Regions:
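Glycan-recognition and catalytic cores of secretory/periplasmic carbohydrate-active enzymes
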Residues: 1-390
Length: 390
């Protein structure tokens, strides 16, 4: 396992070397969705997700500089007010994600002190109407997920009711037709009238939120909704590479993706976690079939990242090892981690870790070093470190 430790150390060295000290804290120049450089707070591919790796790297190594960088990154993100995409709501694209990262860091101290930004962002969410986006990436499923995390931390009923408020609104947007039960990303159809299947924008991500809400409340209403959504996904599962995979949108047949955001790697993780949340072992069998497809696809996108690459599929293997105890899945996670190590670039300035575009390097979470590095940490300690955004 020394090679995994060395890989995590390499990711940290890249993040530490590229950190920029500014009056507000620490920031990094990351790469946006169109492959252009940016300074942005978002968790998805901005500065906001970098502390997720740094926090757990600190726990693994005791490196206090990693924690300093993580706290400085949060401080900068809270202060950042970009001219574009300055969303206050949503976990991966909005400031709710920074509040979620604050929660993740707060757990280190054991003091019970809650970062004030968690409360202020929650108050902002509660002050506005619910909607219009449904998904887990940064819609109401993500906001409901944040409320559940905040309720777990504080026990305050206000936050549980916030999660229920999100769930009720999503329930009102559900469509039941020949495709099954689903919701559109935006009920007004601006994202199209054909529903997505996957974790980021689709049925799987919304099902995950409802399963967690049932686990928190014991309310059979939410279990029934989770069931409907998961059963829809089972209906649309397509045999592929010896396992199961999903098209990007329900009802389509083309299998274009098998990754964390779209396809078996992310959807399998939802089924694995739902098996525990709903107490149903059959769901774990679906997760294992998704895992088989993800393994057989291998490095089909030719990158190490969480969103589209090896780390995203490897994370499913870690989850399957945790839930089944079958060491085959841990071995597969280690195999994918070692494939991901091969993408490290040793440049004159030091080690660099790529995005899913060859020749571009970034410290961010979904498309950069932090997500890849966190997968290394989870592969090292699969029973200790959790997926922080799931």
């Amino acid at each position: 396992m020394n090679d995994l430790i060395a890989a995590a150390d390499s990711v940290y060295s890249f993040i530490n070397r590229t950190a920029e000290k500014v009056p507000e804290g620490y920031r990094w120049k990351t790469v946006d969705y169109t492959d252009h450089p940016q300074y942005h707070f978002n968790v998805f591919n901005g500065v906001g997700g970098i502390p997720l790796f740094l926090r757990d790297y600190h726990l693994l190594t005791g490196n206090t500089r990693a924690l300093e960088l993580a706290e400085g990154a949060v401080a900068w993100c809270i202060s950042d007010n970009p001219e574009v995409c300055n969303h206050q709501r949503g976990v991966q694209l909005g400031k709710t994600g920074i509040a979620s990262v604050c929660l993740y860091l707060d757990g280190l101290s054991g003091s019970g002190t809650l970062h004030p930004f968690c409360q202020s962002n929650a108050a902002h969410l509660l002050s506005e109407p619910v909607g219009p986006i449904t998904d887990l990436l940064s819609g109401e499923a993500s906001n409901g997920w944040f409320f559940l995390k905040l309720w777990e931390r504080t026990g305050a009923d206000l936050y549980l009711q916030g999660a229920i408020r999100c769930a009720r609104w999503i329930s009102e947007q559900l469509i039941r037709d020949e495709l099954g039960t689903y919701c559109l990303v935006n009920p007004d159809g601006s994202w199209g009238r054909v529903p997505y299947a996957g974790l980021s924008h689709g049925t799987a991500g919304v099902a995950h939120f409802f399963a967690l809400l049932f686990q928190a409340t014991g309310d059979a209403t939410w279990k029934a909704v989770a069931h409907e959504l998961l059963e829809t996904l089972v209906r649309h599962a397509i045999p592929d590479h010896g396992g199961l995979n999903w098209s990007i949108k329900l009802g389509e047949k083309a299998l274009l993706r098998c990754q964390h955001s779209h396809g078996a790697s992310g959807i399998g993780g939802v089924f694995a976690k739902a098996s525990a949340a709903l107490g149903e072992s059959d769901l774990l069998k679906v997760a294992a079939m998704a895992g088989e497809a993800a393994y057989q696809y291998g490095d089909f996108r030719n990158n190490p990242t969480l969103c589209t690459g090896l780390a995203g599929s490897g994370e499913l293997f870690v989850e399957l090892f945790k839930f089944t105890g079958n060491e085959m899945w841990w071995d597969r996670a280690k195999e994918f981690a070692r494939l991901a190590m091969g993408y490290k670039a040793s440049l004159p300035e030091g080690d660099c870790w790529p995005t899913d575009t060859a020749g571009l390097y970034s410290a961010d979470y979904a498309y950069g070093a932090s997500g890849t590095g966190h997968f290394f940490l989870r592969t090292l300690r699969p029973l200790e470190f959790e997926m922080p955004l799931l």
